[in-house]
Amino acid sequence: MERGFCTAGCSALSWHTKDGKHLWGRNYDFDRLAEGTQVTFLPRGTAYAPVAGGSGETLRYACAGTGLLLPQNPVLYEGLNDQGLMGGQLYYRSFAAYPDGLDTGKRPVQPPFLLLHLLGQCATVEEAVRCL
């Protein structure tokens, strides 16, 4: 069986229920989690840097999720903020490509820190899209 360009990858799905709720789920396509991974809560005001070694930011919104609490930069694999925005990092080996330069008016964010940055700074999907 030929697998094509993608030999492994996580999946996610979301749906609206008849009673008006929004549900989201995902799988994790690795046989183990990084040592130190845990369910965590990050309160408003938690410091982080969207680029390793870069200038610091603070969370506007509290976040909870599963992740790795690196000393200066927490990483969330999936999470939810106190405004109801939720998301997850999905991994597709060799699928993503990143530009060499920075777009005018945009801030650099390294991929492992993107979910935390969006959940920590955005209250809605529309805000997250503008942030990208």
PLM region spans:
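Alpha/propeptide regions of enzymes that mature by internal proteolysis
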Residues: 1-3, 93, 104-132
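A contiguous strand-loop segment
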Residues: 2-106
